[in-house]
């Protein structure tokens, strides 16, 4: 787990440190991913310590857009510990552990709760609620009705609208 989150954080830090070389705007960096990638996007930005290692404030991220990301401790980590995949855990490897009201704008996208894997919609709904309870104002959740875990293509217009609403270009 640590290696994966560290690699994802290093990749985001690289973008911050190099985006201007490619005529990009460091104020318009969005972090996204699907499934395990959504989990890594969440961990990289919600737990501010990961980007702080590179002298980057995680709140500099313009937006966070996980597609069907685990918000509890990832099932691979639970499996490594001998914990069944259906047993939810919230510890330092869970984005839920780090909920905070000052996080970047966030768009949570999941498949249909009846078709999505392992309660992923419910995890994201709880994350959404706890972020709101902690004062997060700019957070939305979308459940892609009729879609399972493979809802990414259907969700891309939501991502594009979210980015467009928060950028100059």
Regions found by a protein language model. Give the residues of each.
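Solvent-exposed, polar/charged alpha-helical surfaces in well-ordered, non-transmembrane soluble domains
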Residues: 6-13, 42, 97, 125, ...
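Residues at the starts of beta-strands that form the adenosine-phosphate
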Residues: 28, 105, 138-140
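Cap/lid segment of the alpha/beta-hydrolase catalytic domain
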Residues: 1-3
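C-terminal catalytic histidine-bearing segment of alpha/beta-hydrolase fold enzymes
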Residues: 109, 125-128, 132-169
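The feature captures the conserved acid-bearing segment of alpha/beta-hydrolase catalytic domains
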Residues: 55-77, 86-129, 133
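Glycine-rich, phosphate-binding/catalytic loops in enzymes
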Residues: 47-49, 81-84, 123-128, 160
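Primarily recognizes the serine-hydrolase "nucleophile elbow" in alpha/beta-hydrolase
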Residues: 10-80, 90-91
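Residue-level signal for short, function-critical loop segments
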Residues: 35, 112-114, 147
